[in-house]
Amino acid sequence: MIAKEQFIELMKKRTKKFAVDVILFCDSLKNCKASSVISYQLIKSVSSTAANYRAACRARSKKEFFSKICIVVEEADETEFWLEIINDTKLTQELTELDRLLKESLEIIKIMSKAKSSSYN
């Protein structure tokens, strides 16, 4: 089992890497109006996931942490939604990468949801 501080740093890096990976993935989308709108929303939600996790880690109270981690879960879920829309509308040929991003999104949601429920107690 890793120490709390190590876990926090690991998740900061993981959410940031996920944001970078999604941003780079957006370049592979078909060049059309739908992909422009979806990319914009996806980049906003994935970068917000990483940024709000960093903010949660600097929270000054349990209440502030809970508030920020709720935003993280919400934004991570929105990220998954936009990735699913890309999949359903076939806006990319990069299906292996899309599948990997969907799996990572789900893992991040599960981890952050657990942190949220643990901090509520």
Predicted regions and their residues:
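Short, C-terminally biased terminal segments at protein or domain edges
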Residues: M1-N52, A59-N121
